[in-house]
Amino acid sequence: MALPHDSNETSYLLPPNNEDWGRQTIPDFVYGQKDLMAEGIQWPRNAPGIPDALPQSPFDAALCSAWKQRVELGLFRYRLRELQTQILPGAVGFVAQLNVERGVQRRPPQTIKSVRQAFDPVQFNFNKIRPGEVLFRLHREPDLPGTLLQEDILVVINVSPLEWGHVLLVPEPARQLPQRLLPGALRAGIEAVLLSLHPGFRVGFNSLGGLASVNHLHLHGYYLAHRLPVEQAPSEPLDPGGHLHLLQDLPAPGFLFYTRGPGPDLESLISRVCRATDYLTDHEIAHNLFVTRGAPPGKTSPSSALTGVRVILWARKSSFGIKDGEAFNVALCELAGHLPVKTSQDFSSLTEAAAVALIQDCRLPPSQAEDVQAALVALMSQEEQ
């Protein structure tokens, strides 16, 4: 079982007096490979509500208890209540949720002009957040004595939450890393999914130009008590080694990487994904990434078991800034099939066809999409040599 450094019990809660928050040491959530649960996590027959409705791992318990306390302390921009949710009729299975307050009260996005934009310490970044916004530090124990320690990751509340338990995974904020995916950050995101007993705990990444609103390296993590299309969508292999697949039956086709769990296979996946995102960043191509438990590649069905972790990568048109007139903005969760809608009118009138049109508007032109696919296939082939 994952344990804190120096005791059998640790508290991820803030002390009663807010004057003590800044003086309190950030608690560590320490875990090892034995705590990563790759198999046996499935959706119950009746979809659960908030994470409390399912068995909790130590990670779930730490995150949910600390997050709930921050709600009670008023550290969010609004108090998230149970969101009105509907499954849009149609073949895709979009999960639409009405979240008016996020649309109105979220922090305005920074001015971004390039996928490769440098970190700017003058702009808002995660070194400027209030002490109470940090829940804990993810600390991975080395698998073997003498192996390199992995970087620590801060788990921070998203003050404008999409859903219950919405957090940001921030690698060592003092390093002032720009919003460019790195292997350590991706590893922490995948392992967070494997630390949770909830099949609906997902992690994602938005690049600059892919609707990242802060240019300081971070991933999103949150609970959603609904299946999503990307979990079991069928795929076709793109490379002879079977490392890269195409999810074709989605409004925006995505590149699928898959692992059965921790070990060398996971490390190889992290390397392949980051080589792909490095290529996209270096070529000024915006992208979004989504991590979820899911079925293996190939032909699947709605009853396919969640036997591993799917990492889906979308290359897309750059979009700098928020489009206020749309029902939703297309980023990591929308591409995966989760649609946080900004107004009651749009929520009541939204159709699958309208959602598909908004998402497809973000797709690269066909010729550029073909070039990107060929380049990523070539990258995977180089790894085999």
From Swiss-Prot:
One Gene Ontology molecular-function label: GDP-D-glucose phosphorylase activity
Keywords, comma-separated and alphabetical: Cytoplasm, Guanine-nucleotide releasing factor, Hydrolase, Nucleotide-binding, Nucleotidyltransferase, Transferase
Catalytic reactions of this protein: GDP-alpha-D-glucose + phosphate = alpha-D-glucose 1-phosphate + GDP + H(+)
InterPro entries: GDPGP (IPR026506)
Biological processes annotated in GO: glucose metabolic process
Subcellular location: Cytoplasm
Gene Ontology cellular component list: cytoplasm
Presence of keyword Cytoplasm: yes
EC id: 2.7.7.78
Active site: H218
UniProt xrefs under PANTHER family: GDP-D-GLUCOSE PHOSPHORYLASE 1 (PTHR20884:SF8)
Family: Belongs to the GDPGP1 family.
Function of the molecule: Specific and highly efficient GDP-D-glucose phosphorylase regulating the levels of GDP-D-glucose in cells.
Note: The orthologs in A.thaliana are GDP-L-galactose phosphorylases catalyzing the first reaction of the Smirnoff-Wheeler pathway, the major route to ascorbate biosynthesis in plants.
Protein name, per record: GDP-D-glucose phosphorylase 1
Originating organism: Homo sapiens
